[in-house]
From Swiss-Prot:
Pathway the protein contributes to: Carbohydrate degradation; glycolysis; D-glyceraldehyde 3-phosphate and glycerone phosphate from D-glucose: step 3/4
Reaction equation(s) it catalyzes: beta-D-fructose 6-phosphate + ATP = beta-D-fructose 1,6-bisphosphate + ADP + H(+)
Gene3D superfamilies in the cross-refs: 3.40.50.450
Cofactor(s) listed: Mg(2+)
Binding annotation for ATP: G89, R154, G155, G179, D180, G181, G182
Keywords: ATP-binding, Cytoplasm, Glycolysis, Kinase, Magnesium, Metal-binding, Nucleotide-binding, Transferase
Name of this protein: ATP-dependent 6-phosphofructokinase
Length: 459
């Protein structure tokens, strides 16, 4: 996908005429490795080779607008009503973002009214009175809690109904905290707002524990989620090692992207096999997964497998397990996945039993347990900074954009880019290389290079 500078420009509602509460402190700032001036931009690419492909002057190279406070803002804070909604699945840090938005709006911009719309459908006609007035007192301790005080839900809503709700509540700036579905909803909402000629800024704060949203170094909540997942891998590793012919399997979230499985496996440093959606694998054959697990059990007495939920979805019907296959779609239109954890458990157990290695199976599916927890210290800081950036963007009249961290800088990313593609583990990248080095598994099941390393005892 080739992007040009115009693809990365963010829509502005109009001229910024009001003094920002940060104008004085900004006048003392100077561009440095740790500060990007408001008129500067952050390059899309960060390698010489990729920049050379564009053959453009630096001012024309693809780049994002830097996030942060501006000297002049578009909205008069004294007249602003802000709205906040959380969409999609839970994620560590949702309450931290809500708290950060409310604090920044109230304390620094002196915004008098902030409306929280409950459960996503709170924006529709039937539920538009299902709101909560958000103040610093209301959100004071919510960062210590998992989930979201506003509730969340899946499923599309009518954009025109949502716009009417915003108009009835007098909302001037709207913050949408959500994943790919939430960003699509924010895009539709923005289009409906523009069609009606309303002066409402819509800013997204992208979230997903899968880390599968593009144009962000890492999505908030991901670090908390994979840290929690590490505990389950460590637990199943202890169980497998203590059992005769033990095989431990941990199934983790990751519908299309295997970041949680990869990072958690690296952190635990005890997995023998990591399976992700981006890297297909075969079960059968001398160099398939089942034979590999058998060799592990014979060589060291046990094996630990970490699998992302979206891995191996092509294997179900081929192995006569249609009852485990996903059917239909969920409320957000996502195809329901087959249970790869159960497929692996039954297949490995049957294979080892037939090979005369009666296995002791240990299977853990922590599922929601890794996403419903409070944010850890890292994500708490990250969420707060994203919230600050979102408020600055909205008050400066930016709209139809999300705030994200890119190349260590906070930037504004147009909604059109947030939903254009999916962030995935690169099988040729250094992250997957680290996984292969740590597990000693073959680059693909069908290769024989890992056999000697298994028997040598290094893995």
């Amino acid at each position: 996908m080739t992007l040009h500078l115009d693809d990365l420009r963010v829509r502005l509602l109009g001229e910024c005429r009001y003094d920002s509460p940060f104008a004085e402190v900004l006048s003392t700032k100077r561009t440095s490795p740790h500060y990007v001036a408001e008129g500067d931009r952050v390059l899309l690419e960060d390698t010489v080779a990729m920049l050379a492909e564009h053959s453009l002057p630096s001012v024309q190279a693809p780049s994002f607008e830097a996030a942060g406070p501006r000297r002049k803002i578009y909205f008069d804070p004294a007249r602003v009503t802000a709205g906040i909604v959380t969409c999609g699945g839970l994620c560590p840090g949702l309450n931290n973002v809500i708290r950060g938005l409310v604090q920044e709006l109230s304390v620094h911009y002196r915004v008098k009214r902030i409306v929280g719309f409950r459960n996503g459908p709170g924006l529709t006609a039937a539920h538009r009175d299902d709101t909560v007035e958000l103040t610093p007192e209301v959100v004071r301790d919510i960062h210590n809690l998992g989930g979201t005080i506003l509730g969340s839900s899946r499923g599309g809503q009518d954009a025109d109904e949502m716009v009417e709700t915003l108009a009835l509540h007098g909302v001037d700036v709207m913050f949408v905290i959500g994943g790919d579905g939430g960003m699509r909803a924010a895009t539709f909402l923005s289009g409906a707002i523009r069609a009606r000629g309303l002066d409402i800024a819509v800013i997204g704060v992208p979230k997903t524990i899968d880390n599968d949203l593009p144009f962000t170094d890492q999505s908030f909540g991901f670090q908390s989620a994979f840290a929690r997942a590490t505990d389950f891998i460590s637990a199943v590793s202890v169980e497998a090692a203590a059992s005769p012919n033990g095989v431990g399997i941990v199934k983790l979230m990751g519908r299309h992207s295997g970041f949680i499985a990869a990072y958690a496996a690296l952190a635990a440093n005890s997995a023998d096999v990591v399976l992700i959606p981006e890297v297909p694998f075969a079960l059968d054959g001398d160099d398939g997964l089942l034979a590999h697990v058998e060799r592990l059990v014979r060589a060291k007495g046990f094996a630990v497998v970490v699998v992302a939920e979206g891995a191996g979805q092509d294997l179900f019907d081929a192995h006569g397990l249609p009852q485990l296959n996903g059917r239909g779609t969920d409320a957000s239109g996502n195809v329901k996945l087959g249970n790869i954890g159960e497929l692996l458990r039954t297949s490995i157990e049957a294979h080892l039993t037939a090979a005369g290695l009666a296995p002791t199976m240990r299977y853990i599916d922590p599922s929601y347990a890794i996403r419903s927890i409070p944010a850890n210290a890292y994500d708490s800081v990250y969420c707060l900074r994203l919230a600050h950036a979102a408020v600055h963007a909205a008050m400066a009249g930016r709209t139809e954009a999300a705030v994200a961290r890119w190349r260590r800088r906070f930037v504004h990313v147009p909604f059109s880019l947030m939903t254009r593609r999916r962030n995935q583990v690169d099988p040729d990248g250094d992250l997957w290389m680290s996984v292969l080095e740590t597990t000693c598994q073959p680059a693909e099941f069908g290769a024989v290079a890992a056999r000697e390393r298994i028997s040598s005892g290094f893995c």
